C-alpha cells in the first residue's frame, strides 16, 4: 500500500498486513509539532478508509529516551500565546481529531511504549486499543503542571474507561508520573515486557491473522456500548453478531475446524 507522504514519522506494512508507524524525532523525544499532529491524523484516517490490506497497526517511538514527550514546547506551546480564540480552537480540535482518528480506525492499534510517555503522548497511548511497555516506561498527563485542564484530547473520556473514574481523576488532576509497574497494576498498561517491539509486533501479527471484519466489529461495539444502557447493548450485540454470522469468515472458521486446519480469514 501507499501511505500519505509524511516528514515526521516512518511507516511500513509487512506481508502479514501489520502496519508499523514510528514517531521519528528522537532528538526531541518524539515531541509533537503542528505538522506531526496533522500527518498522524491523516494517516490513521487513510488506514481506516483506503488500506483494506492493513489488518493491525503498531505505534512506536524512535530513540532511547522515550515514546513521546507530548507537545513540542518550541514549535507549539510558544506559538499558542499569540493565537486568538478561533486559532486556539483550531489547534485543540486538530489534536482531538488525531485521537478520534486512532480510536475509529478500522484495524486494532497496539502501542509499543518505552521511556517517557507524557502529555499528548500519553493520551495518544490511551487512544490505542492495547498498550505494551518496557519496565522503564514512565507515564504522565502533565496538563495541570502547565496550567491547563487534564481534560485534553479526549483524556477525560478515555482514562475513566481504562482505569476507572477515581484513578483517572488522580492522574488528570495530579499530573504526576507513574512508573510501568504502577501503570500495569491500575490497568493503564496491558503488558510490561523487556522487548516491547517484538512483543507488540507478535501480538499485532496474531491479530492480523485473525478475522479483520470481526475485529473491526468488536472495536465498534466496545466504543458504542460505552454510551448505552445494558438492554440496548445486548440488542446491539445481537445484531452485530448476526451480521458477523453472515460474513464468509464465520463459515471459513467452521470449515477449517472440520478439516483440521488453520482458517484463512479474509
Predicted feature locations:
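Acidic, divalent-metal-coordinating active-site segment for phosphoryl/phosphodiester hydrolysis
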Residues: 175-182
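Glycine- (often His-adjacent) and acidic-residue-rich active-site loop
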Residues: 3, 61-97, 117, 147, ...
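Conserved CoA-thioester-binding segment of acyl-CoA-metabolizing enzymes
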Residues: 1-60, 100
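C-terminal long alpha-helix characteristic of the crotonase
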Residues: 132-137, 189-235, 242-248, 264-266
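CoA-thioester-processing core
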Residues: 98, 102-104, 112, 118-172, ...
Amino acid at each position: 500500500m501507499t501511505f500519505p507522504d509524511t516528514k515526521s514519522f516512518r511507516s511500513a506494512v509487512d506481508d502479514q498486513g501489520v502496519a508499523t508507524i514510528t514517531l521519528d524525532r528522537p532528538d526531541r523525544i518524539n515531541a509533537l509539532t503542528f505538522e506531526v499532529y496533522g500527518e498522524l491524523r491523516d494517516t490513521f484516517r487513510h488506514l481506516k478508509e483506503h488500506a483494506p490490506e492493513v489488518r493491525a497497526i503498531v505505534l512506536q517511538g524512535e530513540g532511547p529516551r522515550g515514546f513521546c514527550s507530548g507537545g513540542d514546547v518550541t514549535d507549539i506551546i510558544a506559538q499558542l500565546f499569540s493565537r486568538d480564540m478561533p486559532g486556539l480552537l483550531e489547534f485543540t480540535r486538530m489534536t482531538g481529531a488525531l485521537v478520534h482518528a486512532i480510536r475509529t480506525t478500522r484495524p486494532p492499534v497496539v502501542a509499543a511504549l518505552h521511556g517517557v510517555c507524557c502529555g499528548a503522548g500519553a493520551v495518544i497511548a490511551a487512544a490505542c486499543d492495547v498498550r505494551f511497555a518496557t519496565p522503564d516506561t514512565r507515564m504522565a498527563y502533565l496538563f495541570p503542571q502547565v496550567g491547563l485542564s487534564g481534560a485534553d484530547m479526549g483524556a477525560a473520556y478515555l482514562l475513566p474507561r481504562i482505569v476507572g473514574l477515581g484513578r483517572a481523576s488522580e492522574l488528570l488532576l495530579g499530573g504526576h508520573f507513574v512508573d510501568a509497574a504502577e501503570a500495569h497494576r491500575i490497568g493503564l498498561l496491558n503488558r510490561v515486557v523487556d522487548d516491547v517491539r517484538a512483543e507488540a509486533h507478535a501480538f499485532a501479527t496474531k491479530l492480523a491473522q485473525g478475522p479483520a471484519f470481526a475485529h473491526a466489529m468488536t472495536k465498534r461495539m466496545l466504543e458504542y456500548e460505552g454510551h448505552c444502557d445494558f438492554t440496548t447493548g445486548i440488542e446491539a450485540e445481537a445484531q452485530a453478531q448476526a451480521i458477523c454470522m453472515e460474513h464468509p469468515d464465520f463459515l471459513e472458521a467452521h470449515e477449517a475446524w472440520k478439516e483440521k486446519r488453520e482458517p484463512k480469514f479474509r
